Curated annotation (Swiss-Prot):
Its EC number is 2.7.1.167, 2.7.7.70. Residues 1-318 are annotated as: Ribokinase. CDD domains: RfaE_like. It comes from Escherichia fergusonii (strain ATCC 35469 / DSM 13698 / CCUG 18766 / IAM 14443 / JCM 21226 / LMG 7866 / NBRC 102419 / NCTC 12128 / CDC 0568-73). PANTHER family: BIFUNCTIONAL PROTEIN HLDE (PTHR46969:SF1). This is Bifunctional protein HldE. The gene is hldE. Pathway: Nucleotide-sugar biosynthesis; ADP-L-glycero-beta-D-manno-heptose biosynthesis; ADP-L-glycero-beta-D-manno-heptose from D-glycero-beta-D-manno-heptose 7-phosphate: step 1/4; Nucleotide-sugar biosynthesis; ADP-L-glycero-beta-D-manno-heptose biosynthesis; ADP-L-glycero-beta-D-manno-heptose from D-glycero-beta-D-manno-heptose 7-phosphate: step 3/4. One of its GO terms (molecular function) is phosphotransferase activity, alcohol group as acceptor. It comes from the Bacteria. GO terms for cellular component: cytosol. ATP binds at residues 195-198. Homodimer.
Length: 477
């Protein structure tokens, strides 16, 4: 499956929030201090990186999108270092300088890839006049496709509700990385992106995925949100939207060195993808891939388009087109965005023969993409008897995915794929045999969506049952 990155260069995003400077001191440690039972680090490298809302803007700019950053800083060396670092990566800064406060700075001391201590230099910006921030937002709304509010509870978003209303009035989606348990502050936002700990701090401990969905949907209703994305660490992400099935995406992280700034990467990629004109589901797909990359780096980091493309391609190509239901929905959404016609068929495909191959090739000719939905082993056993399937599901799917005619392969557990088809809603639903169109599972849903249903003939003389009988006869003979 070929995956096309969003057109990030046409995306304009404004980030407003708590800006900070992350400082890193690196060095070896080989002894314990005689003054106290602590390691002595001989510092040999010092780095400075934008953090907080500034890291979100960096992530947006690293994708090639147009990033604008608004926040509160002091008038000091840290503010100047921030401005220079951000200008170097094409982030347009429009800071509000507050003479009475220092720029928020976090110093981390590391040795042997381990963080030993963090020192914070800050005074909250609560009580600072928010009007200059509002003015900057108003000036930018006509030229951006998304507004990110990055909340680290340092005071820049004290008037967050007014900021939400300004953006919603202009029709600009508002994405918020929340802080604390008072989600009333974020009422009316387009999307909240809490991690699981932040989510459970508001709704209570969730023992199952079903509880996450149930309580998340209540949260959406209570605070008039358009959507909620719960990031769940090694369990991936869950996107919840009113009137839609939950979208659960498994994690793509191979190795985890440091989760610092991972939430910034997620919301940055989400915003840039939405501002480029892609759907929220597609935005989550790319954000999930980006998160898998960034947690494999040390410290606050960004993801380049090449890294993102490689991560996405690696996931999309796994198993020769074999996909989860959630991944398939994203792939179909992307295909539709490109104007491609999606064809779908289903079956057991136990022992693949010439009749199957011919049928699938003919089905593929009717559109641009072909989905093959395959009965699980349990489903096959219920339909065909205890002796079937001959080949387990994984092998059947890999063989189907290797066919040139087949783009995507997905499995289903039920006796029929009606639920799956209703979730995918292909442009054309195809079935082989002597069915009448109205007898085909999922036909009513496809027709109701404006799609077509077609019956194709199988090649005469080819059937899995006949092949099995012949094998059994040959063994007896």
């Amino acid at each position: 499956m070929k995956v096309t990155l969003p057109e990030f260069e046409r995306a304009g995003v404004m980030v407003v929030g708590d800006v900070m400077l992350d400082r890193y001191w690196y060095g070896p440690t080989s002894r314990i201090s005689p003054e106290a039972p602590v390691p002595v680090v001989k510092v040999n490298t010092i780095e400075e990186r934008p953090g907080g809302a500034a890291n979100v803007a960096m992530n947006i700019a690293s994708l090639g999108a147009n990033a604008r950053l608004v926040g509160l800083t002091g008038i000091d060396d840290a503010a100047r270092a921030l401005s220079k670092s951000l200008a170097d990566v094409n982030v347009k800064c429009d800071f509000v300088s507050v003479p009475t406060h220092p720029t928020i700075t976090k110093l981390r001391v590391l040795s042997r890839n381990q963080q030993l201590i963090r020192l914070d230099f800050e005074e909250g910006f609560e009580g600072v006049d928010p009007q200059p921030l509002h003015e900057r937002i108003n000036q930018a709304l006509s030229s951006i496709g998304a507004l990110v509010l990055s909340d680290y509870a340092k005071g820049a978003l004290a008037s967050v509700q007014q900021m939400i209303q300004l953006a919603r009035k202009a029709g600009v989606p508002v994405l918020i990385d929340p802080k604390g348990t008072d989600f009333e502050r974020y009422r009316g936002a387009t999307l909240l992106t809490p991690n699981l700990s932040e989510f459970e701090a508001v709704v209570g401990k969730c023992k199952t995925e079903e509880e996450i969905v149930e309580r998340g949907m209540k949260l959406i209703a209570d605070y008039e949100l358009s959507a909620l994305l719960v990031t769940r660490s090694e369990q991936g992400m869950s996107l919840l939207q009113p009137g839609k099935e939950p979208l659960h995406m498994p994690t793509q992280a191979q190795e985890v060195y440091d989760v610092t700034g991972a939430g910034d990467t997620v919301i940055g990629v989400l915003a840039a993808t939405l501002a480029a004109g892609n759907s929220l589901e597609e935005a989550c797909f790319f954000a999930n891939a980006a998160a898998g990359v960034v947690v494999g780096k040390l410290g606050t980091s960004t993801v380049s388009p090449i890294e993102l493309e490689n991560a996405v391609r690696g996931r999309a190509d796994t198993g020769f087109g074999v996909m989860t239901e959630e991944e398939l929905k994203l792939a179909v959404a992307a295909a539709r965005k490109r104007g491609e016609k999606v064809v779908m068929t289903n079956g057991v495909f136990d022992i693949l023969h010439a009749g199957h191959v011919s049928y699938l090739a003919n089905a593929r000719k009717l559109g641009d993409r072909l989905i093959v939905a395959v009965n699980s082993d349990a489903s096959t056993k219920r339909l065909k008897g205890d002796s079937r399937p001959v080949n387990p599901l994984e092998q059947r799917m890999i063989v189907l995915g290797a066919l040139e005619a087949v783009d995507w392969v997905v499995s289903f557990e039920e006796d029929t794929p009606q639920r799956l088809i209703a979730g995918i809603l292909p442009d054309l639903l195809v079935k082989g045999g002597d069915y009448k169109p109205e007898e085909i599972a999922g036909s009513k849903e496809v027709w109701a969506n404006g799609g077509e249903v077609l019956v194709l003939n199988f090649e005469d003389g080819c059937s899995t049952t006949n092949i099995i009988k012949k094998i059994q006869q040959d063994k007896k003979g």
